[in-house]
Amino acid sequence: MKHTAISERAKEEISSIRVGTSCKIVLVSPDDIPYIWESVEPHLEAMEPHSEGELAPEDFYEAIHNGEMQLWLAVEGKELLASMVTQIVTYPRKTILRIISIGGDNMEKWLGYIPLIEDWALSMGCTSLECWGRKGWLKVLKDWKCSYHIITKDLTSRMH
């Protein structure tokens, strides 16, 4: 399935879902990225120190704008509480929704939307979720498990 088809299906499936009484989750249309990016970018910049340098905010911008990734926002009134970037990944034997970046404030207000993201993932043909994150996420994502660890070694010092 092409990413553009995923983007079109995404727009059909969800535009805004209420979470609780005061917070809602919004799947942002790729066309709207230029208009909201300035508000979202600080959440994605906060992720960088916890990564291995795979992606920077400008990389997210391009991938979301091109429909290769999805941007979700948790908002309360006019306040942006959190931003999350996902990507549908097709492996040879399964399709998953990968949470690549998630961060913001007042987690207790927006964490409850995860089951709605799960429903959206199912509607997109995904059979599971995968999250790139720190170990601390396991404390709040109670029904998730640590499937494996990714270990890394930096080789840039050996490059000529």
Annotated model-derived regions:
Residues 2-10, 131-160:
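Active-site/acyl-donor-binding loops of N-acyltransferases
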Residues 59-61, 87, 136:
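Short, solvent-exposed loop/turn elements at beta->coil junctions and helix N-caps
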Residues 66-107:
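Conserved donor-binding loop and adjoining core beta-sheet/short helix segment
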Residues 2-55:
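Short amphipathic alpha-helix that is part of the acyltransferase structural core
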Residues 22, 96, 148:
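A residue-level signal for beta-strand positions that form part of recognition/binding surfaces
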Residues 64, 76, 119-121:
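Structural motif
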